[in-house]
Amino acid sequence: MPAVVITEFMDQEGVDLIAARFETVYDPDLVDRPQALDALLADCRGLIVRNRTQVRPPLLAKAPHLKTVGRLGVGLDNIDLSACAAAGVSVLPATGTNDETVSEFVMGALLSLTRGGAFQATADVAAGAWPRTRFKARDAKGLRLGLIGFGAIARQVARRAKAFGIAVAAYDPFVPEADPAWALADRRCADVATLLEGSDIVSIHVPLTETTRHLIDAAALARLPPGAFLINTARGGVIDEHALVAALKSGALGGAMLDVMEAEPVAAGSHLAGVPNLLLSPHIAGITKDAVLRASLLVADNVARALEGGTPTVADAARGR
């Protein structure tokens, strides 16, 4: 029976790296075949997942020999960290492998929004239309960007935004005031309300917790200057989508880009369909060929290290160290 089971897509170089050290089963469709997965869990010691495999008590109970879980990404919504810690199972995310990747996506979204949808004009132009007056664009230079959360990805966004002449403000109560990272921001905000009121563009970079769920609700959106833009590449539940749709339809909000939604995938005919000035993408801000390779190699190496009794190069998320 395999020592390592990989249930979702992983770059082949990462698969080869772990398979050279442990008997490995790689089947990216296992996440959708629970009975087949259950049969492999009985003897597996290492499990590698993306964001769909639910690593919770029912799965852990079927994997009595499990020692470590490798997460091909950084979000941990699908992994019960407390249950893993109680079972003595380490959780090793792909920390740092897509920070720059996501920040590039955020900047692309920012430029698309501030250009008033000009990058979505292909079909009209190809059909013979010439809608030059339809697009109400703004220069990026001189705008004020507010970052909610100031971790690794947000800091990369700050670096790139400042290169465009954008003023950067940030809010993060978990980053100490003396942290040198604040040098990347022009302004450190004491609360979300202050940040919203002084931002032309807001980009969200916080995990989904009970504290952050619907952090951006109707009241928060009302604090933004008229015509402001909102970008979310973090977690869908941080924004109250119905409040967002109302703000876009009323024209109070100039535009929004969502790479993450409260329900993924979005149901056909959902409240997000046909909303003006709303750009959607299928949770791909951190996915490029390069980022997937980096994550796959890092996770493969760290899972192998953990199973060999070595020291992984990333912190164990289940124990916070």
Language-model segments: residues:
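Phosphate-binding beta-alpha-beta segment of Rossmann-like dinucleotide-binding domains, i.e.
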Residues: 87, 95-144, 159, 178
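An N-terminal-biased, well-structured beta-alpha scaffold segment characteristic
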Residues: 1-92, 197, 217, 223
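N-terminal Rossmann-fold NAD(P) dinucleotide-binding loop
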Residues: 154-155
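Rossmann-like dinucleotide-binding domain for NAD(H)/NADP(H)
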Residues: 105, 227-321
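Short, well-ordered coil/turn residues at beta-beta hairpins
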Residues: 7, 50, 72, 109, ...
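Glycine-rich Rossmann-fold phosphate-binding loop(s) that bind the pyrophosphate
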Residues: 150-151
